[in-house]
């Protein structure tokens, strides 16, 4: 499943600590999961989790940047996300004189919040199962060269056709994204609204936000203060707009409140967000290729690159700051590749 897609991931705890773990598409919760969720302790109406025609939790869970999840936690567009998700923005604002990576950053008032060019926050307005429509289009359309068939370019055209046929309102800030799931057996259309005036509000120093660094990455339990804060700005009418000093904090439709009561044993819990993708349906040959080709190359090429980067970063603070985000991005799936191969060998998957 791709990063751009909104899922619910459940760890459904009961008094006997049974976990029903998995990833589900939000529109399918009512038909596929509601009964089990209620048996395991869900109390709110399922429509409060996902409602295509009204407010629900999906209106407070956002796609942050290129592949992360954020949660809107105030009525004025304050977004909580991971430190590693905000890391590129923190690096973008850092220099030798103001090393926010090392020292952290806190805006003490709205005027001190830092505009972050290139950073976007995306709300999911609707998720539509368009499988039948796409299959009809696939039967009609011909691609003699075979190069664009089911490509993002082709699927975008199909999305535009569907939106026009169904009279879906499109604004300059609307983004349509059509994705194939389950090996092309299901197709979902995501109708999104994108905000591009995003400002950094706060981040702890890396000694907290990146505690453990690569040693602890992909390891659990963790002891990292892995959080950062940003705010969504819009024009005076609440519409998405490029940065302007006249923009104001977005008055959101819904935000999450944070309970100070904590979580008790047996509480029902679930996580909504953009968790990346999985390859649960790989055949053994694909797993072998992942281990021996993709992961092997990723481990050794990235390892060599990171060695060169680190040597230079240790010599010069300006170089360290400049390459901090690139190094962290490279190291993330370098560590993942190593751990994945070790796990597959240990569990004798092949």
Where does each model-flagged region fall?
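Terminal presequence/propeptide segments associated with secretion/organelle targeting
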Residues: 16-350
């Amino acid at each position: 499943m791709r990063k751009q897609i909104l899922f619910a991931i459940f760890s459904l705890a009961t008094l006997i600590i049974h976990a029903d773990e998995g990833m589900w598409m939000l529109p399918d919760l009512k038909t596929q999961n509601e009964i089990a969720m209620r048996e395991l302790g869900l109390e709110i109406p399922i429509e409060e989790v996902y409602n295509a025609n009204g407010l629900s939790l999906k209106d407070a869970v956002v796609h942050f940047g290129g592949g992360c999840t954020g949660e809107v936690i105030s009525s004025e567009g304050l977004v909580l996300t991971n430190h590693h998700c905000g890391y590129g923005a923190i690096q973008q604002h850092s220099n030798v004189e103001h090393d926010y990576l090392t020292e952290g950053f806190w805006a003490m008032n709205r005027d001190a919040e830092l505009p972050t060019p290139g950073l976007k926050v995306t709300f999911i307005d609707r998720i539509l199962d368009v499988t039948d429509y796409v299959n009809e289009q696939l039967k009609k359309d011909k691609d003699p060269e075979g190069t664009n068939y089911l490509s993002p370019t082709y699927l975008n055209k199909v999305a535009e056709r569907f939106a026009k046929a169904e009279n879906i309102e499109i604004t300059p800030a609307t983004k349509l994204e059509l994705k194939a799931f389950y090996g092309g057996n299901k197709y979902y259309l995501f109708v999104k609204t994108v905000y591009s005036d995003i400002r950094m509000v706060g981040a702890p120093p890396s000694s907290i936000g990146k505690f453990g660094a690569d040693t602890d990455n992909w390891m659990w339990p963790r002891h990292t203060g892995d959080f950062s804060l940003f705010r969504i700005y819009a024009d005076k009418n609440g519409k998405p707009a490029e940065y302007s000093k006249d923009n104001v904090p977005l008055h959101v439709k819904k935000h999450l409140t944070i309970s100070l009561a904590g979580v008790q044993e047996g509480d029902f819990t679930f996580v909504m967000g953009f968790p990346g993708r999985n390859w649960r349906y790989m055949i053994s040959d694909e797993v072998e290729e992942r281990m021996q080709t993709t992961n092997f190359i990723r481990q050794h090429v990235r390892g060599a690159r990171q060695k060169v980067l680190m040597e230079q970063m240790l010599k010069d603070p300006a170089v360290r700051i400049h390459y901090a985000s690139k190094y962290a991005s490279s190291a993330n799936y370098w560590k993942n590749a190593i751990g994945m191969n070790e796990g597959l060998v240990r569990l004798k998957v092949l």
